[in-house]
From Swiss-Prot:
Gene3D superfamilies recorded: Methylthiotransferase, N-terminal domain, Nucleic acid-binding proteins, tm_1862 like domain
Family note: Belongs to the methylthiotransferase family. RimO subfamily.
Organism whose genome encodes this protein: Prochlorococcus marinus (strain AS9601)
Alphabetical list of NCBIfam families matching this protein: 30S ribosomal protein S12 methylthiotransferase RimO, MiaB/RimO family radical SAM methylthiotransferase
Record's protein name: Ribosomal protein uS12 methylthiotransferase RimO
Length: 454
């Protein structure tokens, strides 16, 4: 199925498809590359089988992501496609990739995706292209073409790129470069454009969203940005990647005072124990974890809390892990993502002693999941019998409507599965907000019946 064309130039011969691996920041890069190629006259197709060129936008955050990226690269080169590798693996292994997989036609770094059309032009002329800047410095603004799928009602809005922190386990600063924020005016302009396209929810993303603006305004400016975005006619605005140090009184007040900023706090805390956090090069966090969580719950009783955790970090002892379990039991997060430590070459954690065995790390991960499932189920049960506002997004194979309430972020949290009594076409609900009565809950999802379209 062909994507909607933005094209203003003469069509070119190549038909290009994209294969995406990794996070939503990578997805935004993909959408910009799609828009740029379409503008330059290339036919951008969502069906890889019909394309002769495939751009694989890769992830290199952890080993499993690299393995998936390599599988896709080899799959398409084996099919005889001309493959261009973009994203974090291109940035990470710009010399090794073409040497190890000579079938690759081009590389595009994380700070070079704006050059994708020129790269493809050169590839079509038979050149092997390595377009990877040593230090990524580019960030797209609202003027850069971007493909936004009209069949989706959620869009990610990048407010900054890169990171100035140096967490011991994280390779991202080396792959994405230093922090560079967009101006408030640029972000608001893009939000207004997305609203005109029918987007019902925008999700603000960067490596550290609460550190937004530090580089261009001299201080973190998320609160000011939220106050301006609250004036845009987008029903839901969600923030991902908020760090405790940046959740100031002003930021929390912006959440409270804005009707369309949903009270959903995504806090990648990684751990609870001071010793582990110190080893992670996050010593500032231990004293803040407890107080900031208590403050959020006190100021915004309806707040939904999500966190991500790492188990099996070098030096994590049994008592450290028990501290983490007690932390989870005490604060009862709505959603938790848990990952086993992945040693990444180029990070300080790669060389740390006292490795935790994979067997122990996997057992700890399973333990966290088990504890959190019980907490999540209890949390979800509290919604049974209540009425909730739901964004309906799709129809399931079982002919049920699938949507989300504000307490579920797309892709990473649960969904709300809805039945309909009215004998009308289910497609009429897609992309709309409805009021629903919640009738059942499990540890992941809610179930309910639609009352009316809002």
């Amino acid at each position: 199925m062909k994507q909607n064309s933005l094209n203003v130039k003469e069509k070119k011969l190549s038909k290009v498809a994209f294969s995406h691996v990794g996070c939503e920041k990578n997805l935004v890069d993909t959408e910009h590359m799609q828009g740029l190629l379409d503008k330059e006259g290339y036919e951008v197709d969502s069906n890889i089988n019909d394309a002769n060129v495939v751009v694989v936008n890769t992830c290199s955050f952890i080993e499993t992501a690299r393995e998936e990226s390599i599988r896709k690269i080899l799959e398409y080169t084996n099919q005889g496609k001309e493959v261009i590798v973009a994203g974090c693996m291109a940035q990470h292994f710009k010399d090794e990739l073409i040497r190890e997989i000579p079938e690759i036609k081009g590389l595009v770094g994380t700070g070079d995706y704006q050059k994708i059309a020129k790269v493809l032009d050169r590839v079509e002329q038979g050149e092997i292209v390595n377009e990877v800047s040593k230090i990524p410095e580019f960030i797209a603004d609202e003027e850069m073409p971007r493909f936004v799928d009209k069949n989706k009602f959620v869009a990610y809005l990048r407010i900054a790129e890169g990171c100035n922190y140096n967490c011991a386990f994280c390779i991202i600063p080396k792959l994405r470069g230093p922090q560079r924020s967009r101006t408030i005016e640029s972000i608001v302009s893009e939000a207004k454009s997305l609203a005109k396209k029918g987007i019902q929810e925008i999700i603000l993303i960067s490596q550290i969203t609460t550190n937004y603006g530090q580089d261009i305004y001299g201080k973190p400016s998320l609160a000011k940005l939220l106050n301006e975005l609250s004036k845009v006619s987008i029903p839901w605005i969600r923030i991902h990647y908020a760090y405790p140090t940046g959740l100031t009184d002003e930021v929390i007040r912006a959440f409270k005072d804005s009707k369309n900023i949903v009270p959903y706090f995504d806090l990648p805390l990684q751990h609870s124990h001071p010793d582990v956090l110190k080893s992670m090069n996050r010593p500032w966090q231990a004293s803040l974890n407890e107080s900031i969580l208590e403050k959020i719950r006190e100021e915004i009783p309806s707040a939904v809390l999500r966190t991500s955790l790492i188990v099996g970090f070098p030096g994590e002892k049994k008592e450290h892990f028990e501290h983490l379990l007690q932390f989870l039991d005490r604060h009862k997060f709505d959603h938790v993502g848990v990952f086993i430590f992945s040693p990444e070459e180029g990070t300080t954690a790669f060389h740390l002693p006292n490795k935790v065995s994979l067997e122990v790390a996997e057992a700890r991960k399973d333990n966290v999941i088990s504890v959190q499932q019980n907490i999540s189920k209890d949390k979800n049960q509290t919604y049974v019998g209540s009425k909730m506002k739901i964004l309906v997004e799709k129809i399931s194979d079982n002919n049920e409507l699938i949507g989300r309430s504000y307490n579920f972020a797309p892709e990473i949290d649960g969904t709300v599965i809805l039945s309909v009594k009215d004998k009308i076409d289910l497609k009429n609900y897609i992309g709309k907000f409805v009021e629903a009565n919640i009738t059942f809950a499990d540890e992941y999802d809610l179930y309910g019946e639609i009352i009316k379209i809002l």
